[in-house]
């Protein structure tokens, strides 16, 4: 009987642990116009590098308006 109880508790613990790991969700992100990027934005990675290194944000991308937009957590 004791082995069955230990096995059942172990199984329950594993199920709860897996359920907790699945419940983790991704943070929402927002885009803002870069505060300090100068010049036209062309898709060569400068905007992304600028947003990460100078503004300490998640990423950056050039949009159709040739301006640099940085991505941050909302």
Curated annotation (Swiss-Prot):
GO cellular component, one term: extracellular region
InterPro entries membership: Defensin_plant, Scorpion_toxin-like, Scorpion_toxin-like_sf
Name this protein carries in UniProt: Defensin Lc-def
Protein role: Does not inhibit trypsin or chymotrypsin.
Signal sequence, start to end: 1-27
Family of this protein: Belongs to the DEFL family.
PROSITE patterns found in the cross-reference section: GAMMA_THIONIN
Keyword set, alphabetical order: Antimicrobial, Disulfide bond, Fungicide, Plant defense, Secreted, Signal
Primary location: secreted
A Pfam family per the record: Gamma-thionin
GO terms, biological process: defense response to fungus; killing of cells of another organism
Cysteines engaged in disulfide bonds, as pairs: 30-74, 41-62, 47-68, 51-70
Subcellular location(s) per record: Secreted
